[in-house]
């Protein structure tokens, strides 16, 4: 019997209150806005209509906005019975000392070109926090692993071990997977699986709550990609 081609569906969380207020978030934990809740429900309706999509596992971060979105999608799609893994490795890129700052204000403080480089340069690291992350959700981990600010490259490096260990084997076995994460963490993943150059990743945007559907063969080659606007 021929093994089915597996689908990987990536969804960025719905609008958060920080997105609404144009504030850098990173590892700050913020909920969805009312608009974000509606977007998550709509994303669920889109995921529900994906032909022959039957995920065996849901993967998300340990941040509320992604978890809320994953739960809403699971509810809409009747996926609540599925196992869900919440991992810090799928967290948003850590924006260091920029987190909590309004994006327009950051341009006035640091200059537009510098901020653009921090946001879009693959290896550009924002100003670091002066203290490690103090949050109970990370207490069980080796604090030396916890970033105080990250480039997109560093985000990719801490994310990909989880992908190779927990998602890729399932896809290669023909099992569909659903990942609900964040704009920059998903950009880092997309860069790797699509083999996008450092220069071209600057142009890649991942909008809130618009599912991206990849179909893979058993060697993890992309057969088809579709964005559900």
UniProtKB/Swiss-Prot annotation:
<feature type="site" description="Transition state stabilizer">
    <location>
        <position position="182"/>
    </location>
</feature>
<dbReference type="InterPro" id="IPR001345">
    <property type="entry name" value="PG/BPGM_mutase_AS"/>
</dbReference>
<protein>
    <recommendedName>
        <fullName>2,3-bisphosphoglycerate-dependent phosphoglycerate mutase 2</fullName>
        <ecNumber>5.4.2.11</ecNumber>
    </recommendedName>
</protein>
<feature type="binding site">
    <location>
        <position position="103"/>
    </location>
    <ligand>
        <name>substrate</name>
    </ligand>
</feature>
<dbReference type="InterPro" id="IPR013078">
    <property type="entry name" value="His_Pase_superF_clade-1"/>
</dbReference>
<feature type="binding site">
    <location>
        <begin position="25"/>
        <end position="26"/>
    </location>
    <ligand>
        <name>substrate</name>
    </ligand>
</feature>
<feature type="binding site">
    <location>
        <begin position="92"/>
        <end position="95"/>
    </location>
    <ligand>
        <name>substrate</name>
    </ligand>
</feature>
<dbReference type="GO" id="GO:0004619">
    <property type="term" value="F:phosphoglycerate mutase activity"/>
</dbReference>
<keyword id="KW-0312">Gluconeogenesis</keyword>
<feature type="binding site">
    <location>
        <position position="65"/>
    </location>
    <ligand>
        <name>substrate</name>
    </ligand>
</feature>
<dbReference type="InterPro" id="IPR005952">
    <property type="entry name" value="Phosphogly_mut1"/>
</dbReference>
<dbReference type="GO" id="GO:0006096">
    <property type="term" value="P:glycolytic process"/>
</dbReference>
<dbReference type="GO" id="GO:0006094">
    <property type="term" value="P:gluconeogenesis"/>
</dbReference>
<comment type="function">
    <text>Catalyzes the interconversion of 2-phosphoglycerate and 3-phosphoglycerate.</text>
</comment>
<dbReference type="Pfam" id="PF00300">
    <property type="entry name" value="His_Phos_1"/>
</dbReference>
<feature type="active site" description="Tele-phosphohistidine intermediate">
    <location>
        <position position="13"/>
    </location>
</feature>
<feature type="binding site">
    <location>
        <begin position="12"/>
        <end position="19"/>
    </location>
    <ligand>
        <name>substrate</name>
    </ligand>
</feature>
<dbReference type="InterPro" id="IPR029033">
    <property type="entry name" value="His_PPase_superfam"/>
</dbReference>
<feature type="binding site">
    <location>
        <begin position="119"/>
        <end position="120"/>
    </location>
    <ligand>
        <name>substrate</name>
    </ligand>
</feature>
<comment type="similarity">
    <text>Belongs to the phosphoglycerate mutase family. BPG-dependent PGAM subfamily.</text>
</comment>
<feature type="active site" description="Proton donor/acceptor">
    <location>
        <position position="92"/>
    </location>
</feature>
<keyword id="KW-0324">Glycolysis</keyword>
<keyword id="KW-0413">Isomerase</keyword>
<comment type="pathway">
    <text>Carbohydrate degradation; glycolysis; pyruvate from D-glyceraldehyde 3-phosphate: step 3/5.</text>
</comment>
């Amino acid at each position: 019997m021929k093994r089915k081609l597996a689908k990987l569906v990536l969804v960025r969380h719905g609008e958060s209150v920080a997105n609404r207020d144009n504030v850098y978030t990173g590892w700050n934990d913020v909920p969805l806005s009312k608009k974000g809740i509606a977007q998550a429900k709509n994303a669920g309706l889109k995921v529900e209509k994906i032909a022959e999509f039957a995920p065996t596992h849901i993967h998300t971060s340990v941040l509320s906005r992604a978890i809320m979105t994953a739960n809403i999608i699971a509810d809409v799609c009747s996926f609540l019975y599925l196992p869900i893994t919440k991992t810090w490795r799928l967290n948003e890129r850590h924006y260091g000392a920029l987190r909590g700052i309004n994006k327009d204000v950051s341009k006035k403080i640091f200059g537009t070109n510098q901020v653009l480089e921090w946001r879009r340069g693959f290896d550009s690291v924002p100003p670091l926090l002066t203290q490690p992350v103090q949050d109970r959700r990370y207490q069980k981990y080796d604090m030396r692993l916890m970033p105080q600010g990250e480039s997109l490259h560093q985000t990719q490096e801490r994310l990909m071990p989880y992908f190779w260990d927990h998602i890729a084997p399932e896809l290669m076995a023909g099992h569909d997977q659903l990942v609900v994460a964040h704009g920059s963490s998903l950009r880092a993943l997309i860069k790797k699986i699509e083999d996008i150059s450092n220069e071209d990743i600057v142009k890649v945007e991942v909008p809130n709550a618009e599912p991206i559907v990849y179909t893979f063969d058993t060697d993890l080659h992309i057969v088809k990609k579709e964005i559900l606007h």
